[in-house]
Amino acid sequence: MSMYDVLIIGAGPGGIFTAYELIERRPDLKIAIFEHGHELSRRKCPIDGEKIKSCIHCNCCSIMSGFGGAGAFSDGKYNITNDFGGTLYEYIGKKNAIELMEYVDKINLKFGGEGTKLYSTAGTKFKKTCMQHGLHLLD
């Protein structure tokens, strides 16, 4: 039987970053990550919009469970701001919250995000239309 120093339950962002931080600080640790969900290549949601139009409550949800959690199917955009999207700053202060967001962004870039095209709505008709309807967009 294999012995591990650390067992991490869940391979969502929290579990993945926990493993990363532990390895950075203690490369000697033997770490195992346990995940309920399917591997990425087997994560398929049965909702097709025709026969199945809404959630059928699968035993293991392929959207929420599996490596990367729900973020595995996102477009990968991060909002590096305290203006919306969460309230971490209420616990650690605005400056520290931004520093942590930038730290996470640097790690993501290190593992394949470098060359990602930046997207901005600044000065666009889309942004103007959104603002007219009370929607706030990050530039």
Label the model's feature ranges.
Residues 39-43, 47-139:
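Conserved N-terminal/central alpha/beta ligand/cofactor-binding core
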Residues 13-16, 39:
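Generic N-terminal leader segments that precede the first folded domain
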Residues 18-22:
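Aromatic pocket-lining residues of Rossmann-like dinucleotide-binding sites
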Residues 28-35, 40:
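Short beta-strand "acidic-cap" motif of Rossmann-like dinucleotide-binding folds
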Residues 2-14, 32-34:
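Beta1/beta-strand and adjacent pyrophosphate-binding region of the FAD-binding site
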Residues 4, 28-30, 138:
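Nucleotide donor/acceptor-binding cores
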